[in-house]
Curated annotation (Swiss-Prot):
It catalyses: (6R)-5,10-methylene-5,6,7,8-tetrahydrofolate + NADP(+) = (6R)-5,10-methenyltetrahydrofolate + NADPH; (6R)-5,10-methenyltetrahydrofolate + H2O = (6R)-10-formyltetrahydrofolate + H(+). NADP(+) binds at residues 165-167, 190. It holds the Pfam family THF_DHG_CYH. Coiled coil: none annotated. It comes from Clostridium tetani (strain Massachusetts / E88). One of its GO terms (molecular function) is methylenetetrahydrofolate dehydrogenase (NADP+) activity. This is Bifunctional protein FolD. Gene3D superfamilies: Leucine Dehydrogenase, chain A, domain 1, NAD(P)-binding Rossmann-like Domain. GO terms for cellular component: cytosol. The gene is folD. Its EC number is 1.5.1.5, 3.5.4.9.
Length: 278
């Protein structure tokens, strides 16, 4: 039987540390971080995320600003807003809410964010620095996954890890972070043959495929750490990539959906912001 990893608890512990850091700065009369969010249109998921981000910032003591732009805004106007924020010395982090409207060039717009304010770690410059092993901002979900694995107190070093999915935001960066922790990592994707046999050898499985209940009990090695990044709606219920109830019987540790990785990601964003001042 697995231990369910409580992402909310991991997030709360991180937020306490960050609040202590901000409280110390306030006591010393030092500048408090400010993050500016840009929302284009009115995507419901983004609106929920912004509400949650604002709450976390308020709890920690960080200034949060939200800029809302019309969905049909011209690309040049968005870039102008970003460049103004780049120049603003009182803004220390910029979040561009995804997804952008399909009419916009996402890569072009993202790369207008100053790398030193790109706390989401999405710009090409931060990506290049990350894979070269240089100091930079790292995508928050990938960072959160490592934080969750470490919360189990199990060593990552020397372990076999399988990452299901190769996205630039989750799959690839979490694989690199696991390598940095001295794990031996295999990345699986839609063209990988016999994913099950690869998973059965893994001490750590991170699934970010977006296929509901793809990972079954017979994929799992006894005692494995299973991290579910997937998010789907099945029969009106929110589910992940892992067949949770059955995998729970065999894994050592497992994250639920909801209440797992998604609870930690927003806090990692604020941790990145605070790193600017360290």
């Amino acid at each position: 039987m697995a231990v369910a990893i409580d992402g909310k608890r991991v997030s709360e512990e991180l937020r306490k540390e960050l609040k202590n850091f901000i409280d110390e700065r306030v006591e010393k009369g030092l500048k408090v971080p400010c993050v500016s969010s840009i929302l284009i249109g009115n995507d419901k998921g983004s609106l929920f995320y912004i509400k949650n981000q604002r709450r976390i910032c308020k709890e920690i003591g960080i200034e949060f600003k939200n800029i809302v732009l019309e969905e049909n805004i011209e690309e040049d106007k968005i870039i102008e807003v970003i460049e103004d924020l780049n120049k603003d010395e009182n803004v220390h982090g910029i979040i561009l809410q995804m997804p952008l409207p399909k009419t916009l060039d996402e890569e072009k717009i993202v790369n207008k964010i100053c790398p030193s304010k790109d706390i989401d770690g999405l710009t090409d410059i931060n990506a290049g620095r990350f894979y070269k092993g240089e100091k930079c901002f790292i995508p928050c979900t990938a960072q959160g996954i490592i934080e969750i694995i470490k919360s189990t107190k199990e060593s990552i070093s020397g372990k076999k890890a399988v990452v299901l999915g190769r996205s630039v935001i989750v799959g690839k960066p979490v694989a690199q972070l696991l390598v940095n922790e001295d794990a031996t990592v295999t990345i699986c994707h839609s063209k990988t043959k016999d994913i099950k046999s690869l998973c059965k050898e893994a001490d750590i499985i991170v699934s970010a495929m977006g296929i509901p209940k793809f990972v079954k009990e017979d994929f799992i090695k006894d005692g494995a750490i299973v991290i579910d990044v997937g998010f789907s709606v099945l029969d009106g219920k929110m589910v992940g990539d892992i067949d949770y109830d059955n995998v729970f019987k065999k894994a050592g540790f497992i994250t639920p959906v909801p209440g797992g990785v998604g609870s930690v990601t927003p806090t990692m964003l604020i941790k990145n912001l605070c790193e600017v001042f360290k």
